[in-house]
Each structure stands twice: as C-alpha cells, then as structure tokens.
C-alpha cells in the first residue's frame, strides 16, 4: 500500500495585491498599489526604493501592524490581515521577528531579560537563549542594559530579540541604516546565517550592500512593485 506523501509546509510569507491609502484632509496618498510577493524558507528579499516609496508601509502590513485597504497577507499559512488585533498579535508572537533601525529593546531590561520577555509571549518552542547569544557574540553581554551597549552590540542584541521566538519570518526595516560599513557587513553576515536556519527574511533598506546580499530584490516606486 502506497504511503501518502506528507503535505508541503505552508509558505512562510505571502502577500497578494496589497493596497494602502492614507488620507490627510482632502488629499489621498496611495502608498501601496497592488503589491504581491511570496517569500520561501531561506529567502533573503531586499525591498529597495527611494524614501516615501512604501517600504515601511509594506513591512507594517506584512507584520500585521497595519491593515491593508485591499489584498491579503498570510504568514505560515495563516491570514494575518483583516483580523482582530488580538489575533494578529498572537500570530506575530508565534511566527514573526521584527528588527528596526532603532533596536527593539526594552530599556529597563538587560539583554537576557529582553530575550526572555519575547520567548514568554511566543507560546511555542523558542531558540535557546545561550546558544543565540553565543551565535551573535553576546554571551558576555547578557547582563548589560541597552544604554551600556555599543552601536554594533545594540544591533546584534536587536537581532537576538527578533530571533528569540524562532520566527518563521524575520522583517527588518533599515536595520543597518546607522551602522558603519564594517558593522553593516557583520549584521548582513548574521542575516544570511539566519536564512541558513530556514527563516524567511525581508529587509527594507536603501543600502546597496543589502541588495547585493539578497537572493531577490523588490523595488518600490510610488507604491508600485518591480522585481
């Protein structure tokens, strides 16, 4: 008797025909115009484009922080768009890591406590904190507070927090924007290492180095996407 093949795992991140409008008085801005993308495990997708092209808006919609006016976003097969905030927060906690130019660290908690906080919200098996800190070269800084970290350490600590819940998808918005070239190269090496663990990574950036490191590049111009 033939054994049925196991079903394929769901796509880590899929967005279809995203539209997002912003209104200010009588003026209306179309920030996203029919943007679609599919990001598989191990992909590193760079989202490029000039300031105001829709990069941050796209990442906010992908993370479920902002709801598109049209279209749908699925993470690990679950629809995150057009859901209650409680449902979106639950999906984010389980499947999404977020990394921004300003590190996503609680100032009153040390590095280890920041990781523990994220892991407590994940409700799923998480990356072992000592292993994660060791991978990022922070094993001797776990008791340090954000204001005690250098710029490079702060970037790595932000990445550690973003990876603490073993995310299916990592979304990064200008993560290297304020770093010198050497530190930027190190952070990019770490992001590539993350893809080797099977994580789908999307990075919005102006940096040519980020685009060069990506497996695919999505360029936004006035909210329109071009691969």
Q: Which role does the model predict for each range below?
A:
Residues 26-29, 80-97, 196:
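ABC ATPase NBD coupling module
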Residues 48-50:
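The feature captures the beta-strand-to-loop junction immediately N-terminal to the Walker
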Residues 164-168:
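A short, proline-enriched helix->beta-strand linker immediately N-terminal to the Walker B motif
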Residues 170-173:
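Catalytic Walker B motif of ABC-type/P-loop ATPase nucleotide-binding domains
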Residues 71-79:
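Conserved ABC transporter NBD signature motif
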Residues 145-149, 153:
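Conserved ABC ATPase signature
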Residues 63:
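Helix-to-loop junction immediately C-terminal to a conserved catalytic motif
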